[in-house]
Structure formats: structure tokens, C-alpha cells
Amino acid sequence: MFTDKAIIGLDLAWKKGNRSYGVIVNDGLFLEKVFSFTELSELEELIKEIPSGIKLIFIDAPLNFEKGQKVRACDREFLKKGLPILPFNEKIMEKFYSPFLGLELRRFLESKGFTYCGSFSENSFYEVYAFGNAMLVFGVKKKTDFLKNWKKLLFDFGFTGLSKLKNSHFIDALLSTLPYFVIKWNFDVFSLYKEKGYCLFVPFQ
């Protein structure tokens, strides 16, 4: 049953036209629903159906980049801690992921009244690094190691309804929501990087 907030995690396809995956979690860590979509109009309908007053969306995909930069400034915060990242810059986007969905999704959500990097008390959306979240919260270093024990780790964290997660895309979507709960509990795990147009949860500074 939904509370006053719906926490939405998205494992977003980087290239437009590919399938994206999502989860909806309530404030009590119960996994209410999983879904997938290809068109943003489908996502819009799903969001409209959510009865909760406040909707917070955590997106596992780049939502901003600086032209001419090999490594994004926000991603460097993970590298400083010795944590690997998925490289992303203008050249990579144009070569492998054009047309790129992340930038379109950002414009779409802003047009619907969502605030980029807003507070948890208003409809807001944020960029996250899903496996980076897992590395910081669970101390795992390899994705394969996490996937061997993902259900126990997430259950011990407090999530319920995990039987709905049928593939790794849904798991990544759920991992995307971790910053909300960790920050809500006042643990010093994440900082919100808000510089140069970025809005990414990074290792605590």
C-alpha cells in the first residue's frame, strides 16, 4: 500500500527505442510494482496512475554531460574512491547511443513539473549509478559477486516484495532507489553532487 511518497527507480536504456525497466517502492521499502517501457508516453501513463502525492524518480543513466570532457566531473568522484565507472562523454554517446534517451527524459520530466535535483518533499528526479550504489551500501566490488547474493542483501537492507524482480534490469532499477533510504536514515554514505549542471549521488564527501 502506498504512503505519501512513491519511490521510482529506472534502469533506463541509453539508446532511444530500446526497452527500459522500472520499479515502484513505497516509503516502507515494499516493492509495489515492476514495469517496462519503450516510449516516454508509456512512462507518463504509469506515473499518472500512481496514487501517492509525491513522486521521486532515481534514474540509472546520464542526464547531463559537458562537451569536450573525457570523464564527467561527477563521475570522477567515484574514481577518487577507487570505484570503477561506466565511461560516458559526447563521443561515446554519439558513437554508440544516438539518439540518447537520458537527455530527452530529463527534458520530458521537467516539462511535467518534476524538479531536477529537487528536495524529497516535491516531485523530483535524480541521476544515480545503480551498481555504484551497491558498491557503497553493500561493500561489493564486482557485479557478479553482488548478483550471487542480491536477494539476501536487499532483504537484509529491508526491502520486501523481491519476488517481483525477474531479471537484472529490475534489480538495477531497485538499486537506483538506495540513496533515498540511506539519506532518510541519516547514514553518511552518499553526497549529492550538484555542480556544472550535474545531479548525481556520489560517495560521501
Each PLM stretch: what is its role?
Residues 2-8, 12-205:
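RNase H-like (RuvC/DEDD) metal-dependent nuclease/polynucleotide-processing core
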